[in-house]
Amino acid sequence: MSCFKSKFAGKSYFRRTFHSSIIQFHPQLSILIWHRRYSIIRTYELIANAAYIGTPGKGILAADESTGTIGKRFVSINVENVESNRRALRELLFTTPGALQYISGIILFEETLYQKTASGKLFVDVMKEAGVLPGIKVDKGTVELAGTNGETTTTGLDGLGDRCKKYYEAGARFAKWRAVLKIGNNEPSELAIHENAYGLARYAVICQENGLVPIVEPEILVDGSHDIEKCAYVTERVLAACYKALSDHHVILEGTLLKPNMVTPGSDSGSKVKPEVIAKHTVRALQRTVPAAVPAVVFLSGGQSEEEATVNLNAINQLKGKKPWSLTFSYGRALQQSTLKAWGGKEENVDKAQKAFLARAKANSEATLGGYKGDAQLGEGASESLHVKDYKY
């Protein structure tokens, strides 16, 4: 706990969190602490870390691509998928001068949690010194859900408690678990919604028992020809089911984060809608389903181009209305595409690539405050669609 106070938010921030969050929700949290046998310090830490990650003006870098997925990225820039190249890319990102002031958390793949810089410093220590919380991907991917039309459920609950304990000891303070749903004529089915919602809830409570803030990620794929109204309807159904499941499992909502898709038309719909329309439908879906106790919503980019993801986030934050949560980002491809293009696996391109990453991080920071002016769209690859059908990490 002292590590958190001194290296991430400071004692004054911790005290503010204690008084505003703990005392305000004291009756509810006392019951949860008794029921789940959380220590009082553990509860404080979960809530403070979740609030810190959701700090306005900051967001999450999702650098948790599996070895196979990062290999596909490397193919596009003619780079061999070996450990040294994966480490070099991570170091490029994590050591970009000035960039981590816009980042509150970084989601890591297990390999990266234990990797070091070329000079021998653990990446986790680099993050801590910059005031960035390390996170970890804990799911084991998806498998087909029997009795459905190709729908999936996420695996990884077996042994999750032991893994979370190990990751916490290694420095991780939050976790991510991705559930995937699709829109079709009869999808998502009630079975798929229920199975994925309860899987997310079981994951969330196991994380909290072991000190990790769970990011709840029910991603509704953009694949399909549906319109934006259909996406909004499905998003509301899925989020409502998720929060019912989280309640049933006695998850402390103040110590969680939500990572949803934005509400957009399907990739095959042929429909182009303005950012203001996406913002209206997205915020309305959240207003109808997400409790105010949740400190932050960290959007996934869902295959949008870097620029689309930033512009749409900016529109969401400019929209007037009730928004009791911080609305920020948890982007992977939408923070790294122009950086990858600039780098190309060459040492002499590191400075150029870091400038591209800094520009995107700053742009998304501005978007979380509704102040992005469009001045980061000139980077190579910034307007390139990143959609991959049936995308898997």
Curated annotation (Swiss-Prot):
Molecular function as annotated in GO: fructose-bisphosphate aldolase activity; mRNA binding
Record-level GO cellular component terms: cytosol
Tagged with keyword Cytoplasm: yes
Site (described: Necessary for preference for fructose 1,6-bisphosphate over fructose 1-phosphate): 393
Modified residues (S-glutathionyl cysteine): 207
Broad enzyme group: lyase
Major subcellular location class: cytoplasm
Residue stretches in coiled coil: none
Listed SUPFAM superfamilies: Aldolase
Enzyme nomenclature, EC number: 4.1.2.13
Tissue-wise expression: Highly expressed in flowers.
Pathway(s) it belongs to: Carbohydrate degradation; glycolysis; D-glyceraldehyde 3-phosphate and glycerone phosphate from D-glucose: step 4/4
Catalytic activity of the protein: beta-D-fructose 1,6-bisphosphate = D-glyceraldehyde 3-phosphate + dihydroxyacetone phosphate
Residues the record lists as binding substrate: 73, 301-303, 333
Entry-annotated residues carrying S-nitrosocysteine: 207
GO biological process terms on file: gluconeogenesis; glycolytic process
Similarity comment: family membership: Belongs to the class I fructose-bisphosphate aldolase family.
Quaternary organization: Homotetramer.
Listed PANTHER family: FRUCTOSE-BISPHOSPHATE ALDOLASE
Protein name (Swiss-Prot/TrEMBL): Fructose-bisphosphate aldolase 4, cytosolic
UniProt organism field: Arabidopsis thaliana (Mouse-ear cress)
